[in-house]
């Protein structure tokens, strides 16, 4: 079945393929597409009428997969699925900054939220209004901390613990630059960053492995701090959150 899907995809550009199936079948399909066909089955939860989106990009005679979303249920009446397990962690990326809007690599430059970023945090807080968080963690940079503060504005007494190990990847000499500027000076390195980011060390910056080591250590400490029925907010960055999710899925 997967081979037939990929054949259809690889022969046509801009395909949108709708697959409606069962819990176990869809979990196996997702795991196969991300290259983990025998692992992670119990790590994926799929609610009734939820949807997941996977972006496939042609790469020679093969493909690469990007997870857009898993188990999306915001279109249903119950915004947040019921809790399974002893505690729950909500992992959130910070809202928009002016550099995000302009398409600049910001990394560890401490840019605050812009108006749209604050609005995004407000909407996230409204979406999570029925969640009574009792623990909160944030990267020690302005944009995630501001995001956490806005989300928790109805629970201002809850202390947000800032964690240095959750700060964004260091883009080195790329920080503050537009992609077009980087392409002029480091065209080959930028191409590799888009195709195989795990193999790239940015000039005077960090690698994905560097971020993985510090972010996973910090996240595991957060997990070990959990007590029964804890509801924990954690706000960090794009690269940090991706490494955490990849570690959880075993990819």
Where do the model's predicted regions map?
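Generic beta-sheet signal
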Residues: 8-9, 13-24, 89, 228-239
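Glycine-rich N-terminal loop/short-helix segment of MobA-like nucleotidyltransferase
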Residues: 97-110
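Short glycine/proline- and acidic residue-enriched helix-loop micro-motifs
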Residues: 63, 189-210
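Amphipathic, non-transmembrane alpha-helical scaffold segments
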Residues: 2-3, 118, 141, 183, ...
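Phosphate-coordination/substrate-recognition cap region in phosphate-metabolizing enzymes
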Residues: 4, 122-190
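Acidic, low-complexity terminal tails and accessory targeting/binding regions
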Residues: 31-92, 101, 126-127, 131, ...
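Short catalytic helix/loop segments, enriched in acidic residues and glycine
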Residues: 109-125
């Amino acid at each position: 079945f997967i081979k037939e899907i990929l054949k259809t995809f690889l022969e046509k550009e801009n395909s949108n393929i709708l697959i409606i199936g069962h819990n176990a079948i869809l979990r196996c399909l997702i795991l196969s597409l991300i290259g983990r066909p025998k692992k992670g089955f119990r790590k994926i939860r799929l609610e009734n009428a939820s949807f997941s989106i996977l972006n496939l990009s042609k790469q020679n005679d093969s493909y690469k997969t990007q997870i857009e979303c898993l188990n999306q249920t915001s279109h249903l009446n119950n915004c947040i699925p019921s809790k399974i397990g002893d505690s729950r962690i909500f992992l959130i990326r910070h809202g928009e900054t002016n550099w995000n809007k302009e398409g600049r690599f910001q990394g560890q430059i401490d840019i605050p939220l812009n108006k749209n970023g604050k609005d995004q945090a407000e909407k996230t807080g409204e979406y999570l209004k029925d969640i009574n968080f009792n623990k909160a963690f944030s990267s020690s940079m302005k944009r995630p901390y501001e995001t956490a503060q806005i989300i928790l504005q109805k629970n201002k007494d809850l202390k947000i613990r800032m964690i240095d190990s959750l700060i964004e990847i260091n883009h080195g000499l790329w920080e503050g630059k537009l992609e077009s500027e980087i392409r002029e000076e480091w065209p080959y390195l930028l191409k590799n960053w888009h195709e195989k980011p795990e193999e790239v060390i940015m000039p005077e910056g960090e690698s994905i492995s560097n971020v993985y080591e510090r972010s996973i250590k910090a996240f595991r400490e957060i997990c070990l701090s959990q007590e029964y029925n804890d509801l924990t907010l954690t706000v960090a960055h794009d690269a940090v959150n991706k490494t955490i999710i990849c570690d959880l899925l075993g990819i």
